Amino acid sequence: MSKVYDWFEERLEIQAIADDVTTKYVPPHVNIFYCLGGVTLVCFIIQFATGFAMTFYYRPTVTEAFNSIQYIMTEVNFGWLIRSIHRWSASMMVLMMILHVFRVYLTGGFKKPRELTWITGVVLAVITVTFGVTGYSLPWDQVGYWAVKIVSGVPEAIPVVGSSIVELLRGGTSVGQSTLTRFYSLHTFVLPWLIAVFMLLHFLMIRKQGISGPL
């Protein structure tokens, strides 16, 4: 076993990487509130795992979406638990994200030279809320349908381009199958890639600049 490790160590310098990851300086003023970003990440990982599990059974059509959710809840082994964890961790992720933003703002973590870290964090917050909006519609029940109708109709108040934005979101002039398809694609493909990219940028900046000092 040691020979295998030595072979990889010689080529990849695994120990040096491990030392760099585990020996970063942590300022003495850091407390439990500085863990809120990490808790948000844990919630996202739970979201990813449980959401991926549900894609095996969910059907993104207006005629089958609600019934497929009922099937997950009543027929799939531990389906009720997986979906419940997905919903609970979604609420927890939004809450932890909000608290994290407030903590960073109140402790001045957005100031020079960490402006870009703050900007990527704000983008991540917007993506998180968008996850919630798109996911809320997927059961395609009365609550989900009317939520989509209201949210997708908001841009109509924008002069000139408002109607075009609404049609782009809905896939037409009214809420229907095209709308559900768009929201499902956003929720399961577009947003996960976006949040992964901005998370990577966010974490790399934090690793490079370290944790901000006290006010």
From Swiss-Prot:
Pfam families: Cytochrome_B. Its main location: membrane. Heme 1 (or BH or b566) is high-potential and absorbs at about 566 nm, and heme 2 (or BL or b562) is low-potential and absorbs at about 562 nm. InterPro entries: Cyt_b/b6_N, Cyt_B6_PetB, Cytb/b6-like_sf, Cytochrome_b_N_euk/bac, Di-haem_cyt_TM. Heme b 2 binds at residues 86, 187. Belongs to the cytochrome b family. PetB subfamily. Heme b 1 binds at residues 100, 202. Component of the cytochrome b6-f complex, which mediates electron transfer between photosystem II (PSII) and photosystem I (PSI), cyclic electron flow around PSI, and state transitions. It is a multi-pass membrane protein. Keywords: Electron transport, Heme, Iron, Membrane, Metal-binding, Photosynthesis, Thylakoid, Transmembrane, Transmembrane helix, Transport. The keyword Isomerase does not apply. It comes from the Bacteria. Binds 2 heme b groups non-covalently with two histidine residues as axial ligands. GO terms for cellular component: plasma membrane-derived thylakoid membrane. Its cofactor is heme b; heme c. Gene3D superfamilies: Cytochrome Bc1 Complex, Chain C (1.20.810.10). It is found in: Cellular thylakoid membrane. The chain crosses the membrane at residues 32-52, 90-110, 116-136, 186-206. Heme c binds at residue 35. GO terms for molecular function: electron transporter, transferring electrons within cytochrome b6/f complex of photosystem II activity; metal ion binding; oxidoreductase activity. The keyword Oxidoreductase does not apply. This is Cytochrome b6. The gene is petB.
